[in-house]
UniProtKB/Swiss-Prot annotation:
Subunit structure: Part of the 50S ribosomal subunit. Contacts the 5S and 23S rRNAs.
GO biological process: ribosomal large subunit assembly; translation
PANTHER family reported for this sequence: LARGE RIBOSOMAL SUBUNIT PROTEIN UL18, RIBOSOMAL PROTEIN L5-RELATED
InterPro entries with a match to the protein in the record: Rbsml_uL18_euk
Protein known as: Large ribosomal subunit protein uL18
Annotated organism of origin: Methanococcoides burtonii (strain DSM 6242 / NBRC 107633 / OCM 468 / ACE-M)
NCBIfam families: PRK08569.1
Entry similarity comment: Belongs to the universal ribosomal protein uL18 family.
Entry-linked Pfam families: Ribosomal_L5e (PF17144)
GO molecular function: 5S rRNA binding; structural constituent of ribosome
This protein's UniProt keywords: Ribonucleoprotein, Ribosomal protein, RNA-binding, rRNA-binding
UniProt GO cellular component terms: cytosolic large ribosomal subunit
Keyword RNA-binding in annotation: yes
Physiological role: This is one of the proteins that bind and probably mediate the attachment of the 5S RNA into the large ribosomal subunit, where it forms part of the central protuberance.
Length: 173
């Protein structure tokens, strides 16, 4: 570890690899609400966050665990669950009176066709206004889980996807 008067210690969250302060500053200066998408190995979490001088305020949120309420029994960490979580989040957010946001993926790698962009597609399909480029979205076959049904015997993920999507649409229609 370097020492001396010229050595500057980075912020703790930067050292831990948890916050990109340059990106955060750009997002905060836009003064728009952020659609924050975070993924773990088992779940997807999406929040609408408003900047505030006293700290960010969460306005609306959805997590993939909530899909069980709509009859989804598959893995909550896959592309299908990410899309359905985004769709659920979008409808919940619109019902609460919010109409737009800017995507915030944090320090996650931006990879076309990833779960992050599957969640964004769900948010956009619900009607929430989020600036995006549709070329980064995964294909509809991957979102429905048809690639899983091909190699996994007894998998009915596309049918479950359609049923859960209909239940979400029915609740918010």
């Amino acid at each position: 570890m370097a020492t001396g008067p010229r050595y500057k210690v980075a912020f703790r969250r930067r050292r831990e690899g948890r916050t990109d302060y340059h990106q955060r500053l750009r997002l905060l200066l836009s003064r728009e609400d952020r659609v924050v998408v975070r993924k773990s190995a088992r779940h997807m979490q999406i929040q609408l966050v408003a900047p505030d001088a006293n700290g960010d305020v969460t306005l609306s949120s959805a997590i993939s665990k909530e899909l069980a309420k709509y009859g989804y029994e598959g893995s909550t960490g896959n592309t299908t669950a990410a899309y359905l979580t985004g769709l659920l989040f979008g409808y919940k957010t619109l019902a609460e009176g919010y109409e737009s946001g800017v995507l915030d993926i944090g320090i996650q790698a931006s990879s076309a066709g990833s779960r992050v962009y599957a969640a964004l597609k769900g948010v956009v399909d619900s009607g929430l206004d989020v600036p995006h480029n549709s070329s980064v979205f995964p294909s509809d076959e991957r979102i429905r889980g048809e690639h899983v049904a091909e190699y996994m015997e007894g998998s009915n993920l596309p049918e479950v996807f359609d049923a859960v999507k209909e239940k979400i649409l029915a609740e918010f229609s």
